[in-house]
């Protein structure tokens, strides 16, 4: 059975999609959409460090809403607008993962869907 995961503690999706779908069966699988740096009030913080922190806050809220924790994350895909920002993005990921090492893909892109977004992250978690 699949169910949409939509924590009330984060901003709603920016378009017609779910933040995440939790799939239950022999195991629990969670596939998130690309999560962007939008705060619950709809604002986007200035600065890459704050944007990375907001994305991870949103991702952790999604994990918790699905009954999962960071240790359940099996794959991360990160999109970043500027190659020189990779160190900041990786440091944010490493801080949140706290030694947990899921598969990870980091892609430098020319732009994201909204010009103020500098980072977008999706993940897969399984338990």
Segments and roles (model prediction):
Residues 1-127:
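Short, polar/acidic, helix-capping and beta-turn segments at strand->helix junctions
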């Amino acid at each position: 059975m699949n169910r949409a995961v939509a924590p009330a503690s984060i901003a709603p999706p920016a378009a017609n999609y779910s933040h995440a779908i939790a799939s239950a069966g022999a195991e629990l699988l969670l596939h998130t959409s690309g999560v962007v740096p939008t705060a619950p009030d709809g604002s986007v913080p200035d600065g890459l460090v704050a944007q990375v922190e907001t994305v991870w806050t949103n991702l952790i809220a999604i994990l918790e809403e699905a009954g999962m924790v960071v240790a359940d994350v099996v794959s991360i895909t990160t999109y970043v607008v500027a190659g020189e920002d990779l160190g900041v993005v990786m440091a944010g990921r490493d801080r949140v993962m706290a030694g947990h090492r899921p598969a990870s893909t980091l892609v430098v892109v020319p732009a994201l869907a909204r010009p103020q977004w500098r980072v977008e992250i999706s993940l897969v978690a399984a338990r």
